[in-house]
């Protein structure tokens, strides 16, 4: 996982850059720095990145209040409102307990001129809070409705803000997380706190109330110590000694939520390990806070229930059209992504989607919905303007954010009272002596580009402006300069101390000593003498920024060599061995997984989330172990001091390691707690350990308890989040499978697939000048016939619930799935007498007329005894092997068969996976029983015993039936797709993705079936198959396929004529060795008639010569002379007979010919046809020629013996002659011995006999070998 540069070191070192809430001394005297920068700054992100990519951490727990609301109305609003306070020593997290720390007098604050605003929350906060309420009270819908009624009453001004707080507190009694979460939507000055005794404290402007079970009762409370502080601030605690300041309390684990919605902050981490990003949400919430609504007076934000009601209105309006709602979300998310890109680019990026385009797309989406469109316009006030970054600027002008989402005030441009610095000098402010007059509200907010540096510099002093100009020129990067200004912004907001500011800007100004010294003098900063003895860390960080590593020497892809001109930093602790073996030349440039161009190698969002959890867990562990190591060292010192006398204790001193082995570890542990005062604490430990060690040790142990308690809470959150995303992180294919599979299952994609294969064959044949190869274009397999029943059951289940399909069509579909398809696939037929549909399928008969009632204007369904798709010939082939079925289909039938095969294949894969898991489970239990001697139940696995996994409601043996039930529930809409996918992942892990689109697949199949039973051409295709099936032209055994070639050719011609306007596919279902193979071939049905006159003349001449048996073309004579296709002796006999007939006709002897023809029966009805496009001759079915002599069989029996002996004598005479010439007597004798098995060694013991027999009137020698019993050697 890609780590930040500052995270690659131990988190202990990062503590120097972070402000610890428990330490407040550093804020007692601080200056403000005014930079001549544009008045709009980008939100301060978690890390501030310089121009070269080096990033610097910002304190994660700081949260500075926004400008309070000046409106007279106080009530819940979508805004992240916190108390205005100049010393953010206490942070009130959402859902956490009150955090207290030292209180210090606040400097006077000048009144803010003009209308004041508070930061607006996104609509996700409201939606997530509603989702949490809905989840909490899932079994009590009335509570959720009452909450919405309270919000509506407040909107109508029926109740005030205290009334809302009282009613919400009573409604959510017993749920402190919901009550505390409601603080997010309260105006400034109001705060709700839940006590341990279930009492609710409500802080209102001026006093604090307690809400008992019956309402609000004012309770006397001490007045606030600081009038300038809003009363929502926690009561200050008495001041404590400086060496032991009070640290911020960490939220208790009971307040940590198992599933943190987007609207709630993750429980506040200590300053060591704050989660850097919210958890990945499976469903992105709706965000419609695109701009400031012009219809809301005084620039009020969009109200809580206004946004909720609008979103709910869209959901309800398009309840039957979920695609519109999804498209609406997609438009908003695309717009927000563009705005984020524009914000990150700093004004150098033009969004591809403007507000005008957003409004236009929503207008097209909400056509004829004027009320929704007009209401949406409230969220896009500048839809008709051309401001590039209106939304981004509006958010930036209001505030900048730290990494916890807290609101940080914008730098004020009005005069502030000057405060004396530590060295007595004063910091000059903007010119002017009084408050500036109110600024009139402009119709549009200025964009970032409209505010120039020159305008901003008018408010600065010449020396300061000159300094910032030098800094901008020295940094030579706009991004680095903006990061430098961000440091000043958060210092002006008193988020960081002066020392931390100097440390943050040192990477920018460290390599410019003159500017850096001027800046430190301007701040009045003096380095502490106690810290001079410690080595400076990262002193050469600025130097690394000047090196151009792209031009340096490379070693592989991960290392760069430092240039020779680079001056190595001095190191006094190196030995000669260190100088010999340590690397000072090569710098590591690793290749991160996120930088890969291959999508398959990148981590998914769920993997990234788990990696972040592990990073946070690691950082927290490092901090805890560092603190524990320091505790052990100090305990050892305390034990040693207890054995010393008072005089020895007074003389006892510690070195820089504080009694341990490392200077850095213990110093970082103390700096994490005492912050700026850590140097004094360390100095006290070294000089006076007898007094300082017990105090510091007590402090460390207290923090150890707090952090351990926080760790337990975080472990719960991390565990739940890991469980939520663990299975998704393993599934790499499921993320993109749904989107890609939807495209694959489209009818157009299936047709394009086979058409592209057909075109490739045609092009290949054209290039090679060869004939087009004949054969199937696709070959698909049906591996298991049992799956056909499950596929048919799912399809019929969905068909039953389709109101758009007529009852008669449903019955036809049922017959196709239970009878017709199994017959094609040589499978067992299904049962049509479904008990579930007995009453539904029965014909409703009118009692008066006795005629079947009509449904939707169509006659009742046919009786069950009538089978519309009877295929008796195919049924006979079911139990045979090496058989086939032939089916010529159109587009709809082809698409249906493709989808049906995909469905069966996926069901088989899920079924096979379930069987494998059953086998693994059985093997594991068998191994535990035999090897470990443990016999456990099915639901008693080690993971469940250790509470690492929740017990499943379904046994492994029931996974496949449970999967089928879930598919039915998904088709019926009883479960949503996310719940369905999560359940599948839990059962089948990474193999579940193949079934994510099962509902879409079945719906596509049902649509094709509806076409098959209702479309005229599809019905004719089916009828043609059934008719040809009766003629024996649709299949049979493979070894007799040639005998049916004429019938199949006729079937093909009829199918091509029927489907002349669309594709014609030849489907062959071949059963071999128990498996069924489906082959698909796209036929060419286009006839291309030749217009060449030469070809036409040759064709006419060919037909004429063929019809006349007297003449033959010269080409044919020449071809027959070279390669005759008949026996020449037959030709001689025919010619001899012809000459004999001609001679008899001349002599007038007609009696013999008539007598010869009397005993002969003949038929001459053979017909043929020619295909004009290919000149191919095709014989007509049931036309034939034959000739038969009545006495031919009798005469053959009578002459059989004579003919057989004559032929044998002729053959024997030829053999004897050849043997006499080529075979000597010795060879003939050897042959006789070999036949009798004599004179050969190594033969199995046997006896050979020779008997003479007569076969077909001829004597033959019959040799018989009889083997003896073979005894094997022991």
Curated annotation (Swiss-Prot):
Residues 889-968 are annotated as: Interaction with OGT. It comes from the Eukaryota. GO terms for cellular component: kinetochore; nucleolus; nucleoplasm; nucleus; Sin3-type complex; transcription regulator complex; transcription repressor complex. Changing residue 307 to V: Greatly reduced binding to MAD. One of its GO terms (molecular function) is transcription regulator inhibitor activity. InterPro entries: HDAC_interact_dom, PAH, PAH_sf, Sin3-like, Sin3_C. Residues 524-851 are annotated as: Interaction with NCOR1. SUMO1 sumoylated by TOPORS. Probably desumoylated by SENP2. Residues 835-847 have a biased composition (Acidic residues). It holds the Pfam family PAH. Keywords: Acetylation, Biological rhythms, Coiled coil, Isopeptide bond, Nucleus, Phosphoprotein, Repeat, Repressor, Transcription, Transcription regulation, Ubl conjugation. The modification Phosphothreonine is found at residue 284. Gene3D superfamilies: Paired amphipathic helix (1.20.1160.11). Residues 459-526 are annotated as: Interaction with SAP30. Changing residue 308 to D: Greatly reduced binding to MAD. Disruption phenotype: SIN3A knockdown causes a significant decrease in the amount of cortical progenitors in the proliferative zone at the peak of neurogenesis, and results in altered neuronal identity and aberrant corticocortical projections. Residues 1139-1157 have a biased composition (Basic and acidic residues). Residues 252-266, 284-297, 412-425 have a biased composition (Polar residues). Acts as a transcriptional repressor. Corepressor for REST. Interacts with MXI1 to repress MYC responsive genes and antagonize MYC oncogenic activities. Also interacts with MXD1-MAX heterodimers to repress transcription by tethering SIN3A to DNA. Acts cooperatively with OGT to repress transcription in parallel with histone deacetylation. Involved in the control of the circadian rhythms. Required for the transcriptional repression of circadian target genes, such as PER1, mediated by the large PER complex through histone deacetylation. Interacts with ARID4B, BRMS1L, HCFC1, HDAC1, HDAC2, MXI1, SAP30L, SAP130, SFPQ and TOPORS. Interacts with OGT (via TPRs 1-6); the interaction mediates transcriptional repression in parallel with histone deacetylase. Interacts with BAZ2A, MXD1, MXD3, MXD4, MBD2, DACH1, NCOR1, NR4A2, REST, RLIM, SAP30, SETDB1, SMYD2, and SUDS3. Interacts with PHF12 in a complex composed of HDAC1, PHF12 and SAP30. Interacts with TET1; the interaction recruits SIN3A to gene promoters. The large PER complex involved in the histone deacetylation is composed of at least HDAC1, PER2, SFPQ and SIN3A. This is Paired amphipathic helix protein Sin3a. It comes from Mus musculus. The lineage of its organism: Eukaryota, Metazoa, Chordata, Craniata, Vertebrata.
